[in-house]
Amino acid sequence: ALQESLCAVLPFAHLASRQIPRAAEIFDFFADYIGQLAGETYDQLHDYRTVVTRQPAGVAAIFTPWNACLALSSMQIASCIAFGNSCVLKPSEFAPLAVLQLVRLLESVGLPTGVVNVVNGRGSVTGAALATAAGVDRISLTGRGDTARKVMAAAAAQLTPVHFELEGNSANIIFDDADIDRAIDGALVSAFGNSGQICIAGSRILVQQNIADRFIAAF
């Protein structure tokens, strides 16, 4: 939590109470899911049996942003491992230290070297090289829309499937039957949680007209 706080300039209390526990819970979830992986059979057609099995995709290139680097990296790493894949992770150049420590921790408890790899550098150089690498089978990026367009264009040359989670600009909508005090608390947390640097931040507030004056006065 301290390394993430120093790199990303995020509140230590928020990281220690939310993002770090979330990262641990993500690994718990996928560890439990590993035991449930099995083939599926279907008998909906007479004299036919359909069998579905899952196979690893291979190597995933993962790009994570600075504002929740450890939590989002944990989600990508854990899912890769659970489904039998390896990954090359490029964290934001502004917040790489906690991710490096996480990978060292994973290897210290027995994860084979080379399953989870980290490369550091600027997106325009290291990220571009990773997005066009011939040995990459999947690409996942959490970040800005303009970055996603560049990655998608680069991946197209290799026909590499991509997965994006992109920036948002969400609104809190307050109706006249809402508890005003609770709505204000929720709007404040939504707008300024994680120092306001989060893709689900409530950057706008839409209030029903007949309670607008009361809401604004209380806000």
Please identify what each model-predicted range represents:
Residues S5, F63, N117, S140-T142, ...:
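Short beta-strand segments
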Residues E40-T113, D137, D181:
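Conserved small-residue-rich beta-alpha loop and adjacent elements
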Residues R49-T50, N117-D137:
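A structured beta-alpha segment of the ubiquitous adenosine-cofactor-binding alpha/beta core
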Residues R138, D146-F219:
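ALDH superfamily catalytic-core signature
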Residues Y33, F63, V119-R122, T142, ...:
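Conserved residues at the C-terminal ends of beta-strands
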Residues A1-Y48:
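N-terminal Rossmann-like NAD(P)+-binding subdomain of aldehyde/semialdehyde dehydrogenases
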Residues A60, N67, R122-A129, G143-K150, ...:
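Beta-loop-alpha module in the N-terminal Rossmann-like domain of NAD(P)-dependent dehydrogenases
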